[in-house]
From Swiss-Prot:
Cysteine pairs bridged by disulfides in the record: 7-19
Role summary: Causes rapid, rigid paralysis when injected into Lepidopteran larvae. The physiological role may be to reduce hemolymph loss following injury and promote wound healing.
Any one GO cellular component localisation term in the record: extracellular space
Gene Ontology molecular function terms on file: cytokine activity
Organism: Spodoptera exigua
Protein name from the UniProt record: Paralytic peptide 2
Entry similarity comment: Belongs to the GBP/PSP1/paralytic peptide family.
Domain of life: Eukaryota
Amino acid sequence: ENFAGGCTPGYQRTADGRCKPTF
């Protein structure tokens, strides 16, 4: 279940390769 690159559910991967919340 790789949402946006292995981020926690509810998080999205940014161009930096980090994960930030999208809620």
